[in-house]
């Protein structure tokens, strides 16, 4: 292929896929660009959310590669062990240098881009492309007492705030 487009890789599919693409490219003498679409903050935060689930507060302590803060804050499922494993994984891939092979990182918002740009390795590679939908003609509809939420039902998505606002 001329381009390999990866989305979030984690758990069973690790960044090792990047090394395999580079290995194939070298073996075949075929240039292959790697594009990565970031749907979370995995590249700069071991728990992927930049949020401490124990406190509910936004957190940037790991930004800059200070991944041990994930362990200190028990940021992965409130577990020291799971957080330490996440810290080791993030540190391994950082030290391994695998991310230097990514040619372009697509961020789904300018905010995400600004956070990934804190890593000098990513700064010249990021681009913000918002998720998109076709523009539809808006129709006035009668107001009713319900809401529609489409997304993962989890605390960090702000479900509690949405419910509070609707009361």
Segments from the language model and where they lie:
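Conserved donor-binding/catalytic core segment of Leloir-type glycosyltransferases
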Residues: 106, 139-157, 163-167
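Short N-terminal targeting/anchoring amphipathic segment
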Residues: 1-13, 32-37
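An amphipathic, basic-hydrophobic alpha-helix
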Residues: 1-3, 12-19, 89-94
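Short aromatic-enriched loop/helix-cap "lid" or pocket-rim segments at secondary-structure transitions
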Residues: 17-18, 45-51, 56-57, 72, ...
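A short helix->loop->beta-strand "cap" motif at the edges of active sites that frequently abuts
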Residues: 24-34, 123-124
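A short beta-strand/loop micro-motif in the catalytic core of glycosyltransferases
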Residues: 35-36, 100-110
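Membrane-proximal helix-turn-helix segments that form the acceptor-binding/catalytic region
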Residues: 23, 42, 54-105
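Carbohydrate-associated surface elements
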Residues: 111, 132
